[in-house]
Amino acid sequence: MKALIIDDEPLARNELTYLLNEIGGFEEINEAENVKETLEALLINQYDIIFLDVNLMDENGIELGAKIQKMKEPPAIIFATAHDQYAVQAFELNATDYILKPFGQKRIEQAVNKVRATKAKDDNNASAIANDMSANFDQSLPVEIDDKIHMLKQQNIIGIGTHNGITTIHTTNHKYETTEPLNRYEKRLNPTYFIRIHRSYIINTKHIKEVQQWFNYTYMVILTNGVKMQVGRSFMKDFKASIGLL
């Protein structure tokens, strides 16, 4: 699991990081001390669990928690604070737990186990749904070039772009160019992984390497092969939802 600790007190963050490492089972544990750092962390990582303090230097933790819950796939939120008067509000946000400082390892472990149990159940359900969806879509994409039909495995397709009537399909080991329109391929791609980010671009979200802020409040997506594709303004909402961004 991946965890994010949001607290403006360095000692509290350090203590919680230490306890989580003692409990074990975490692939990654990151920290944020304010809203800006939180948003940056959520942009580049999909977390399973967030430990959130109520009193932050630039925003109330309850308000931040409400924003996080609006994500397409929000992480489990555990409020970790010295203030007990916000517990009702926290659970109204469907918080997984509410832990009071000073932290104890046993209490933290109880909260983590709640998240793990819920995640295991959700993963099983998601796997079943994904298998059903995959069954309804071809696993290979037929691409006709020079009287030959190439069968491209969808998991190897990194992104597809079109310019001046030429559609370029980027894969993990080759680049294919065709005059077929982008819309033709969009209908055949598995929507579990592929998303249109621009009228000229479709990407495989499994091949996103990095997302950079760009002009006019948009993003530039850098794919695993180094190709850059800009997110169109009208596609921003769907793109942010697809990568779990606020």
UniProtKB/Swiss-Prot annotation:
Task: State the Gene3D superfamilies in the record.
Answer: 3.40.50.2300, LytTr DNA-binding domain (2.40.50.1020)
GO terms (BP aspect): regulation of DNA-templated transcription
Which InterPro entries does this one have?
CheY-like_superfamily, LytR-like, LytTR_DNA-bd_dom, Sig_transdc_resp-reg_receiver
Q: Where is the HTH LytTR-type domain?
A: 141-245
Disruption of the gene: reported phenotype: Deletion significantly reduces target tissue survival during calcium-daptomycin treatment and increases susceptibility to host defense cationic antimicrobial peptides.
Q: What is its main location?
A: cytoplasm
Q: Which UniProt keywords apply?
A: Cytoplasm, DNA-binding, Phosphoprotein, Transcription, Transcription regulation, Two-component regulatory system
Spell out the post-translational modification annotation for this entry: Phosphorylated and dephosphorylated by LytS.
Q: Which Pfam families match?
A: LytTR (PF04397), Response_reg (PF00072)
- Which GO cellular component terms, listed alphabetically, does the Swiss-Prot or TrEMBL entry include? cytosol; protein-DNA complex
MF annotations from Gene Ontology:
phosphorelay response regulator activity; transcription cis-regulatory region binding
* Residues covered by the Response regulatory domain: 2-116
Provide the protein's localization: Cytoplasm
| Sequence positions bearing 4-aspartylphosphate | D53
Classification via SUPFAM superfamilies: CheY-like
Binding partners and assembly: Homodimer; when phosphorylated.
What does this protein do, in the record's words? Answer: Member of the two-component regulatory system LytR/LytS that regulates genes involved in autolysis, programmed cell death, biofilm formation and cell wall metabolism. Also participates in sensing and responding to host defense cationic antimicrobial peptides (HDPs). Upon phosphorylation by LytS, functions as a transcription regulator by direct binding to promoter regions of target genes including lrgA and lrgB, to positively regulate their expression.
Name of the protein in its database record: Transcriptional regulatory protein LytR
Organism encoding this protein: Staphylococcus aureus (strain NCTC 8325 / PS 47)
